[in-house]
Amino acid sequence: MATPPPKGPRHVRDFARSAFVALALAATITGCFTGERPRFGCAPGESTGRIEIDEVLNRFECVATSTFTADYTVLTRLGDIDSAATVVQASSGRRSITINNVRFIYDNGRTLTCDLVSETCEAVINEARTSDLLLTSEFYAQSMASRLRVDAERRIGDPVASNVVLGGQPALCVAVPVTGGTKTYCALESGALARFDGSDLLVELTSYSSTPDEAAFGT
């Protein structure tokens, strides 16, 4: 018989980090698949069987075709930690994701994880740098797509769709009831996350522009 894991704040935090990293790894191999609902040259993955969920998934899974600058506030509920994040997605797959003082850069085959305070970088994407916040460089779309697919399978009731305005932009939302509460996912037409409200995180869009901020690629 397996010995149950010890309980306590440290072990809860370690479990949360491990679970989030697992979702992040799933997100990194999730892309756009050939399907029946094409959108701007990209088609989402397999249908969940509920259009309310699929329409939001469609946006998340096809974010790669969009260019934008998006600012977010983040609350990591475990530890009650407030953070700020900025995502810049430019053409040719160039991306910059800044979470507090950590910047992840994907730039024409070059990858960097930089500390903006010490002005030092490592030539890899080191997701561990923000694991204490339960955030990865994919938090703004692909991580959310992976989470939403898991919640679609685990839901205990009907999803509810809604339309809201967040960060001055119209967004499509779906609320999914799961054991322990309801999780809400909202996405912009571009595919960028507009809001996520779950038991571990609250992420909200505060401002948005369709123009990529090239300064965000600086280190």
Q: Model-predicted segments: where are they?
A:
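N-terminal leader/targeting segments and the immediate start of mature chains
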Residues: A2, G8, R13-R94, A215, ...
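Short, hydrophobic/aromatic-rich segments at coil-to-beta transitions
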Residues: V63-T73, A90-I97, L166-A175, S190-R195
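A short, amphipathic edge element
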Residues: S146-V160
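Gly/Pro-enriched, hydrophobic low-complexity segments
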Residues: S162-T219
